[in-house]
Amino acid sequence: MEEVITIAQIVHRGTDILSLNNEEIEALVDEIYSTLKGSNDIKNIRLIDFLFTLKDFVNHVRAEQSKLPDLSMPMEAYIRQLLVDSDVVPIVSEKKKELRVRPSTRKEIFLINGTHLAVPAEAPIEIYGLKLRLKTFSPQCFMRMAEIGSFSPETLGYVASGANLTNFIRVFMKCVDQETWKKNGEGVVVTTKENIIQFTHQYIELYKFLRSGGHSWLINRLAEEMVHRKLDREDQGSHISNIVETEEIEPEENIKRVIFFLKELSTMYSVSPVFTSGYMPLLYDLYRAGYLEVLWNPVEQKFLQHAEQREKEQMILQQVDMKLMEVTTQARQYFKIMEEKIGRVQSDAIREILTMEGKVDDPNSILQEVIKACGKQEAELITTEYLNIKKQWELQEKNACAHLKLVKQLRSGLQYAESLKVLESIRVLYKEKNNTTNWNLCKACGFKLLCPHVDMLIQLQAAEASYDTMRTKLMKFSGINKEKENNQGLIYSYFCKICGEELAHFIQEDRTADVGVIGDLNSKLRIFIWQETMKACTFIHFGKLVDVKQFANIAVNVCLPLVYSIENIKKEEDYDPLTQLYAVIYIYAYILNLIYSSQKNKEFLTITIHGMKADSSLNAYVTFLLEKMMQQYSGIINQLSEITDQWIANNFREAFKKIIHQNGLQGLSVQDDTKVLLTEILLDPLYDYAATVARIDGSIPMYKPRTPKEAEYEFKTVIGRTPAELLSQKEFYDKIYTSKYRPDFTQLARLKDIYFQEESLRVWWGGRDEEKTSTLIYLRAYELFLKYLQNAPNFNSELAEFKTYENAYGEQKALLAQQGFYNIFDPNTGRADQRTRLFEYKRLPISTLYDERGLPHKWTIYVYKAVDSSQKPAEIEVTRKDVIKKIDDHYALADLRCSVCHVLQHEVGQLNIKKVQTALKASLEFNTFYAFYESRCPKGGLHDFQDKKCVKCGLFTYIIYDHLSQPELVHDYYNNYKDQYDKEKMSIRSIQIKKDMTTPSTETQPKPPQEPWTFDYGKIIKTAKILDISPAVIEAIGAMEGRSYADIREGQGAPPPPTSMDDPRLMAVDSAVRIFLYNYNCLRHVSTFNKPPMHVERLVKHLSYEEKEDLEKVLPNVVNEYHTTFKHLRVTDPASALLYSIEFLCISFLTLYEIKEPSWVVNIVREFALTELNTIIQSEKLLSKPGAFNFMIFGEDFVCSGEDSSMDDISAYSSPGLFGEDIIDRLDDPFSIEDVDISLDVLDNLAPQ
């Protein structure tokens, strides 16, 4: 008997084959091959094939990864696919300690590095003591061996990378045998390794060609004459020669090969179930671009048959699902009726029986148990009640009452004001008024209309009531209180006792004594503190596993009352930047207190900052937190002109004092590592998958474990070891957690998005280079982690190098983003243009869309021609549904025919375009005419239809919408009433014009002012002196665009005075004046606003309501005759109009700035005047030349280091000031606190005695 060598003898030879070098692998190959080369047994031949494939697999994993194109899906997405793959079904057998793989009935094709691999079912594979019996050996199976078996982490890393490489080669199953092609002129499907390599090269070239965007000619050739048209060598057909092979051949033969390639690719997708969930980006892109339409011929019969079969199966599944839903609903209702009519004792007994038998989710079993447990009368009672309920449901389904539309509109309203209006309409339909105990019934249909709690909820939301108020008032409807636990704690949900809808919920942290209520969604400040605390976790090092949500919840409970206790801070939904800054200060003070507390109790938990030693001084932590705060929240700080570094440091010190004295030393509860690890394992999808297989196999019971002993048995059966044995490596897991590389928060979020995202090719310009680079960063990080497990010192050095490249990549992205901002910056809108994709529009004659009667084409008739001239009939025309029945391999798709006008698709250019345009115009006129007389009658009033005809005007109902079936009737009716239609249309239009028209003015120009105006340059000088700027800057308002700020300050390069009333400078200055006056009037009449603008509210928030009312009396009216004078000068003397507007702006500023009494108004008005005028000037500076103004107004990130700004009077290195030239000559660190009295001794004395 001939010896058969098993896979176990090849793979499991006392060592891991993946750890061998190339020489050792080749020696192993020679040894096994010399034993098998004389064998005739088909099993040994397959093993030889497997051996060479395994060698290529290892070599590719080690050396070829960087050379292959990035066409593979991300590794995580590939692993996720394994969990849902149904081509092989693993069955775990505990008794025999082996994994049998039951093949499915569908066809299975798997590849490793492009080569088929079929392992006989009799050949067991032994990997690390685990015997496997496989029908087909595939990357999917190999990954399952790695995860379900006992592979080491190092081996798993190589396997994952190998599967990543082989994934994109799965599409190269079909290729063209060149020799057979030249002899027979057609392709032959082969699977030799050499052809696969050649086909791989062709595929990559085609992929690059499609991404280049120059492929529009290809579809024209394929869709028109295909292989019958001769192409010149100078034509773009030369591109395709580089795709098929290096030597130049006839273009029409190239097209034949491309057609063959596309056919084989689509056929492979149709007949192979592997590719239904595979990675086929090129085929998807070709299909989306419409290229596969040229392949709609008999070759696709298998595809159509599969599609039809899948559609039938889907319909059957839908019917089964509907039946299942119906039975499930019936079972639930039976239980509910039993509890209401008979009692819960009997229903609980039935539920317990079903749970013991594992049938609690089986609706048929529920129905049988309910009927069996009840007597005859009780069963009839339940059945009758259910039939009544079902009948009521059917009546409700058929109900067409008007209240249904109103209720739907109420529930889907986007604004509270709109919902309140709809609610008023609903209340009219209430059968009873002031009902708060039962459903409000509709007096029209008698069905349930609206629950009273919804009525009250809409009113409270429209009144902008707080969350606490809403919860208090809605609690009177609460009748059900359910409690459940999740990873955040205990959730208490309250439900309406009338309709069962959820009213409110809140979360109680069960892991600490502190209450963490994050349910108040209307409190923006509460959410702000929670979010900013979570962001701070990126630079805090806890040392042990800590619940960061608990950390944020405690921060909310500690900081929120302290922020609200500050004077002038109120509990309102809209909070200003000052309130946000106070919240940030208290958050960072809370973090400092945690660090201070951990230093006092080091045995429990050590909290520090990343990059700082745990025993660092408290002064060092204070310096870091202050710098971090000023850098992270510079946008908020820059909005507050009165805030200084000293102010922030002083308030930070006071906040730290309050937190220490009110909360004392604080600590966080450390999570139980054992509990966390076991929870993660039990919730892992792979564990659930393996447990399900074990239940099917009978290794563990079908029901969930009910005792600790059963739970431990299940865990050991699935994992292979007990929890105690698994947790014995706790120190190893701690070491991984504390030492392995973890990206920062933003980078991690970015990588996760790419990590779980399916990559897809794009045929438009741009591609996916950024995602490719980010994916490589992730894979490199994963590879470094595997190396860490082997050699930690080398890992640390490689990690430092990797992080250097990662940071450089981030800086490169930032520079590219800034460059793109300036390249596509739109000065009209003040922001970057969002239109980044390029589209190319193709001009087509209108006859390609419409025929000569103005009707759109419908290409629903397929024209097939015989491939052989001797075939009869030579041409067949069929519809799409008849293709399978009437078309065979002897016919090919030649053209399409329109079912409306019966013209062929390639003949649309021969249609008369003028006729098409005339018909479209007439069709539009007919549509407008008959829409106008759809209900109104030209004889007066409405139509009086009898027997589908108006007895007054003779209009038939069927020609209102159909203008083609009876063209004579359509034209006759149109000609009879065309004049009447024109008169009525003009009459309606004239009435509308009269409504919109106003009485024309008899004056030819604006009325002159009562007092003549003379220019006073002293007002401009006085204003410039207060603002500490050059008078020329004020004169340049409206004329700074395109000028450097140095020229503006010196008064150089100013444009000539305006000579036209439409000069844009007049509109710019007039707009500035109007904005100043509008904001001033908002300040004067602030008492009339329910919600004044934020900048106005900030100025008057300390005033009482009576004082706000008095502002209108004590503040002067500065408008006077501005509008009259400006309109007059704009028409008569545009140059004077410009000077007048600038002078009026200065006069208004001086009038407010020089107010002396009453004293409580002086500071408000002065601050308003300074802020408004500085804002106008700052806005004008934005229009000056780039680099000529202070980019610090955008924040520190916009300042480019290294740029010479010595020629500009505003340095790009300076920090923004309050007034003047925005220059503060400060060369030291702007975040320095060297002049702030915060020392270690002072902070140490802050602790409670």
Curated annotation (Swiss-Prot):
One of its GO terms (cellular component) is virion component. Keywords: Host cytoplasm, Host-virus interaction, Inhibition of host innate immune response by virus, Inhibition of host IRF3 by virus, Inhibition of host RLR pathway by virus, Late protein, Viral immunoevasion, Virion. It is found in: Virion; Host cytoplasm. GO terms for biological process: symbiont-mediated suppression of host cytoplasmic pattern recognition receptor signaling pathway via inhibition of IRF3 activity. Induction: Expressed in the late phase of the viral replicative cycle. Its main location: virion. Belongs to the asfivirus M1249L family. Together with the penton and the other minor capsid proteins (p17, p49), forms a complicated network immediately below the outer capsid shell, stabilizing the whole capsid. In addition, blocks IFN-beta transactivation mediated by the cGAS-STING pathway and regulates the transcriptional activity of IFN-beta. Mechanistically, suppresses the phosphorylation of host key adapter protein TBK1 and degrades host IRF3 in the cytoplasm. Interacts with the minor capsid protein p17 and with the hexon capsid protein p72 capsomers; these interactions form a rigid zipper structure that stabilizes the capsomers. Interacts with host IRF3. This is Minor capsid protein M1249L.
